[in-house]
């Protein structure tokens, strides 16, 4: 009998049911000859490229390092020849492109038994293999550094944002690597694993070397920041690490095989996908290979590297992000023209305020497009944010203090325990149409510079 961990019930939040959820079936992927790693996938990173065009790299060899902490490197997903280091304005590194070898060659870091490793051994192994940068931290919601001392490590296996991939489906066949990754992290600090009330995989409910907590409630119960807030909040001067569950699998593969394997199971979802499902693809795979012949016709499409709430706008030339668990396709909406807007009675549109009759239809699935349906306007203090943000903070006052640049007020209002994704739902329901995630990201970046 597995004794279930403590259950935390959340009332605040909002589940947005969209059409096009990924079916639990595997889809074919056309093999790619070119891959790329994007530094912007790792927030807080200032990259310094360590390879040149024409260099040959193995899977696991470093492509770039963090200029502020050069021992943190970032591994190539494939072996091959570096074809380009693409740069943007002010020579910002946009991506490092690699032409893949036909026969893949892996850097060998040696199989290790994590049970006999120390915390320093685990850190050294992740640093050597270029995987340490997949660990994020609070405060600031950035890629962490090895000299930070976390009071705890949080892993959330609950993905509950609209159209997000199901981690239990991704976990099939990866249970051993997942447990090895958890055990390795537990050598560094206490690990809290957050799971959903409907998740039943034994690799989650019976995970060893961690404290399992069940979160029962609507989105954003799966946000790791929400889980931190309810289990062990971050105060000024404290640090917690947060790790994506797929990155835990990456770590486990490293210790079990001695190789860097950045293959992840990604959901292909959204109303503009012909056939929804899952693909196994490497980080850095071009989206045109993942989405080949699977984009529906009929209107302009918005491709998202991620989910509709927190995903990054992409195109077919973009590559699969390092932390991306789904690729989502929704209508752009730029070819839709309506009169009278919200004044018309509507039977297909979603409303959080019950302005339309659709709330009477229960758990109806909606086909929403990417339109804002309104312009940015003055901030309205209406309590909208608090209704969908189950955290013990004054969210509206925090946003106002970030906009005004009042750092003392930000610290008092709890900025150290938030990340941009925590405000994704608030951004969705916001009557003022403010880019809340962007505001929070800029506020955290300014605060980090002030405290440096």
Residue ranges with predicted function:
Residues 61, 67, 78, 86, ...:
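Glycine-rich, histidine-containing beta strand-loop boundary motifs that form or position
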Residues 71-79:
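Short coil-to-beta-strand transition motifs
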Residues 2-50, 65, 215:
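N-terminal, Lys/Arg-enriched amphipathic/low-complexity engagement segments
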Residues 45, 51, 68-71, 275:
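Short, solvent-exposed loop/turn positions at domain surfaces
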Residues 51-65, 84:
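Short, well-structured beta-strand-loop connectors
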Residues 72, 86-452:
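Buried, small/hydrophobic-residue-enriched core segments of structured protein domains
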